[in-house]
Amino acid sequence: MSRKNKALLEIAKDIGGDEAVEIVKALEKKGEATDEELAEITGIRVNTVRKILYALYDEKLADFKRIKDEETGWYYYYWHLETKRLPEIIRARKLRELERLKKMLQEETSEVYYHCGNPEHPKLTFDEAFEYGFTCPICGEILQEYDNSAVIEELKKRIEELEIELGLRPSPKKEKKKTRAKAKRKTRKK
């Protein structure tokens, strides 16, 4: 499976789950098809196929041409994948993810959280914990200050990875190579 194909299927899965993946695969194989044909090929209900096709269209991953049947007067929509802009779409999605992660990091670093210790229960901000008298609103246990340093480190790591992928930050490996090259040049000049 090509990298482009894998990225397309990942985006399809984000958009509409396994059903969207099946529709994209069917469109790749067939090239162009109506929603009814795709429903027949995949075994997915026509309404669901249409919903997914419109979601793919909204993401600019699918397009259609409308053809009128002269006998019936009905319009048929022939759908096809539109992957020319896939790199641009992937970049835009990564930028949105980066902004979301930065917002989460801001929230994690600007708040003090409290938690009862049960992983299924929510962590609460100081104000929320104060409101509940520092007892868990679900189980009644005493709330303790929540150590979110691991969460913060994971967010920082993921942000750095995305920034490197997007070319917004130089790769640490590239930095080392540049430094070594500069050191060699300085040594040669002496």
Swiss-Prot record:
Keyword annotations from UniProtKB, A to Z: DNA-binding, Transcription, Transcription regulation
Pfam name, any one: TFIIE_alpha
InterPro entries per UniProt: TF_E_archaea (IPR016481), TFE (IPR039997), TFIIE/TFIIEa_HTH (IPR017919), TFIIE_asu (IPR002853), TFIIEa/SarR/Rpc3_HTH_dom (IPR024550), WH-like_DNA-bd_sf (IPR036388), WH_DNA-bd_sf (IPR036390)
Ranges of biased composition (kind: Basic residues): 174-190
Gene3D superfamilies linked to this entry: Winged helix-like DNA-binding domain superfamily/Winged helix DNA-binding domain
Residue segments, region Disordered: 170-190
Recorded GO MF terms: DNA binding
HTH TFE/IIEalpha-type domain boundaries: 4-87
Assembly: Monomer. Interaction with RNA polymerase subunits RpoF and RpoE is necessary for Tfe stimulatory transcription activity. Able to interact with Tbp and RNA polymerase in the absence of DNA promoter. Interacts both with the preinitiation and elongation complexes.
Similarity annotation: Belongs to the TFE family.
Function field: Transcription factor that plays a role in the activation of archaeal genes transcribed by RNA polymerase. Facilitates transcription initiation by enhancing TATA-box recognition by TATA-box-binding protein (Tbp), and transcription factor B (Tfb) and RNA polymerase recruitment. Not absolutely required for transcription in vitro, but particularly important in cases where Tbp or Tfb function is not optimal. It dynamically alters the nucleic acid-binding properties of RNA polymerases by stabilizing the initiation complex and destabilizing elongation complexes.
Descriptive protein name: Transcription factor E
Origin species: Pyrococcus abyssi (strain GE5 / Orsay)
